[in-house]
């Protein structure tokens, strides 16, 4: 047992170091690739967000770290930038529904054949959270220059239970209940 403890601590240290490298890489890529990364955010505010992520690394699980990286990139408020970690195999989209926003609310616009009865249904809530509340809570992680773009992109993010779970907005990382 004594031998395992240092190995576990070493693995944890290595993971924290790797996450710091990932964060540094993301920041460097933003500053090198983006033509005007600080057009919509002051550089000092961006640096505060990055430092907050850096300090929180020891407490973050994988999903929390991915959320933190998404927030860093979304903070520059550019709809053409974004991390798609929550659309990867690590966080499968288990929902068989696709939704879009309309003036009257959020509606199912496509779905698998076994859920065809839900086509055109209005989504009221996910895991008891009103859909509009979910969009508001997720907005700082969705890359967008304005509120319209957040509303447009939100359904892609909200169909990923792992994302909502990482935010503490649904109980399970691999499923949720949709209310119509």
Where are these regions (language model features)?
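Flexible, low-complexity junctional segments that flank or bridge functional domains
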Residues: 1-180
């Amino acid at each position: 047992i004594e031998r395992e403890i240092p190995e576990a601590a070493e693995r944890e240290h290595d993971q924290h170091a790797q996450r710091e490298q990932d964060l540094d890489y993301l920041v460097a890529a933003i500053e090198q690739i983006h033509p005007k990364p600080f057009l919509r955010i002051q550089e000092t505010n961006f640096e505060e967000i990055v430092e907050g992520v850096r300090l929180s690394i020891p407490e973050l699980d994988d999903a929390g770290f991915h959320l933190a990286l998404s927030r860093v990139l979304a903070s520059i408020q550019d709809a053409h930038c974004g991390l798609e970690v929550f659309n990867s195999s690590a966080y499968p989209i288990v929902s068989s529904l696709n939704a879009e926003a309309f003036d009257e609310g959020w509606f199912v616009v496509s779905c698998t054949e076994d859920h065809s009865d839900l086509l055109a249904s209005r989504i009221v809530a996910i895991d008891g959270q009103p859909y509009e509340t979910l969009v508001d809570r997720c907005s700082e992680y969705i890359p967008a220059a304005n509120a319209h773009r957040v509303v447009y992109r939100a359904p892609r993010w909200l169909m990923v239970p792992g994302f909502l779970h990482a935010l503490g907005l649904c109980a399970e990382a691999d499923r949720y209940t949709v209310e119509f």
